[in-house]
Amino acid sequence: MSSILFNRRWASVLLEALTRHGVHHVCIAPGSRSTPLTMAAASHPRLHSHTHFDERGLGHLALGLAKVSGQPVAVIVTSGTAVANLYPALIEAGLTGERLILLTADRPPELIDCGANQAIRQQNMFASHPTETLSLPRPTPDISAAWLVSSIDSAMARLDHGALHINCPFADPLYGEDDDGQQGWSAALGCWWQGETPWLQESSPYTGALRAEVDWAQWRRRRGVVLIGRVDAEAGRQAAAWGEELGWPVLGDVLSQSGQPLPCADLWLPHAEARRLLAQAEIVVQFGASLTGKRLLQWQAACKPQRYWLIDPLPGRLDPACHRGRRLVAPVQAWLQAHPAQPAAPWAPQLKVLAGRAAQCVEQTLQASFGEAQVAHRLAQLLPLRGQLFVGNSLIVRLVDALGQLPAGYPVYSNRGASGIDGLVSTIAGVQRGSGLPTLAILGDLSALYDINGLALLRQVTAPTVVIVVNNNGGQIFSMLPTPPAERERFYLMPQNVDFRHAAALFDLDYACPVDWAALTDAVSQGWRRCGTTLIELRVPGTAGAEALQQLLGKVAAL
């Protein structure tokens, strides 16, 4: 069998093995060395191929697909710096748990470290960030197909979160048509080809049914606080209902999808009455990590309950404050089922009153002003029916967290693992494609500029998509930090003075630039009636959002 045919056959077996582990989407960037993988993916009847010319955006497209589907998503790139461009998405997946399969084509070993073109040291180049790595040999019929598929099966069985990096060297020639002349190597897998299960069904360690904490019957009768970070929509809804049934205050992050029963917590947590009441908590039960609000993080770090339990399906330490307590690795819904609530009246009803007064203060303060603070506060009014929301990083996510209140169980996505602004537009595209739902996204101008190539992916949406770019002319998150005033604009804010009308035109997207709330709601409503993507630019005064937040913090503290 020629090298052409065997490269293709090797790649076909590899991809078939991945489909046995739930891989249905594959994201492909152009490249020559990756031709065997690309052609195998293109011809596979159960793989849906997505393409993008920018590998960094491609990785984030896969990240978005994995967020929504809950299934592993494969990525195919050529050798060299194309591989390095996957690093940001890989890091994010490692922190937030999405499973990515990075298939990186490589030069064969004899072309490494000898001056050959587009040949870099790719083995283990991602250091400790992948959950699993697999460095394949150069394809050869001397290695059995059973070895290849069982290697894939074993790596996938261990991949409960994060990325698997599979480095795939291919020697020339890379091009040519396959034929059925020599099938002995792959045919040795026999009836495996007609099935849908892995060759090697390697089980994870048996843990048995989830058992309740032995002292839960005691602690559920005490004064507790429920803290909900980044969890999925159903987990957030159930955790909030569980906490309210217990009579415990529920503090929900913007990504908790809990409905935030005590809204605007990041505004009222510094209030003297809130501090006095919450200091009486005997136990804090936290679901999910990655808290957003500064004041919430400060309270979480400073609180000293008798017990602190943190429940998250991801392993590892997820508490930067390093509380003494219990780190419980478990699915949230299963844990809730094993720990039923004992109904009780709220032990701190004053917090609900304080939260209501804070929300009323926000409404009265922002009612007459149009800007990013008002949009963050009223964002729930713009959400599509039976749709989903993606929130960017930096200032906007903090404003939505502090000023808004999103519906319980409404899907909210974000890249809050490493909290970078790279790849957000591409992630939005992946989230939309993965669900097929109408999608509202909101992000800042520098975030949009950073991933401007991602707008190309938004030309191919499957449901109405509205992307709101808050153009406050720079990284205004830094206006909230003690950055040196004389150097702030040049070295931190970096205003770009851009008009996103031209970006929308470049990628043939609908565009609007509303100047008040009525015009914004009209533009968003029109977006839901279109089948494509609408880019809405909000041109707002640079520091107005940060100043509004600071003003409201002062007002709520004085309530």
Curated annotation (Swiss-Prot):
Q: Does the keyword Magnesium apply?
A: yes
InterPro entries per the UniProt record, alphabetical: DHS-like_NAD/FAD-binding_dom, MenaQ_synth_MenD, MenD_middle, THDP-binding, Thiamin_PyroP_enz_TPP-bd_dom
One GO BP annotation is: menaquinone biosynthetic process
Determine if Manganese is one of this entry's keywords. Answer: yes
Enzyme nomenclature, EC number: 2.2.1.9
GO MF annotation terms: 2-succinyl-5-enolpyruvyl-6-hydroxy-3-cyclohexene-1-carboxylic-acid synthase activity; magnesium ion binding; manganese ion binding; thiamine pyrophosphate binding
What is its EC class?
transferase
> Which function does this protein serve?
Catalyzes the thiamine diphosphate-dependent decarboxylation of 2-oxoglutarate and the subsequent addition of the resulting succinic semialdehyde-thiamine pyrophosphate anion to isochorismate to yield 2-succinyl-5-enolpyruvyl-6-hydroxy-3-cyclohexene-1-carboxylate (SEPHCHC).
- The protein, known as: 2-succinyl-5-enolpyruvyl-6-hydroxy-3-cyclohexene-1-carboxylate synthase
Q: Which organism is it from?
A: Edwardsiella ictaluri (strain 93-146)
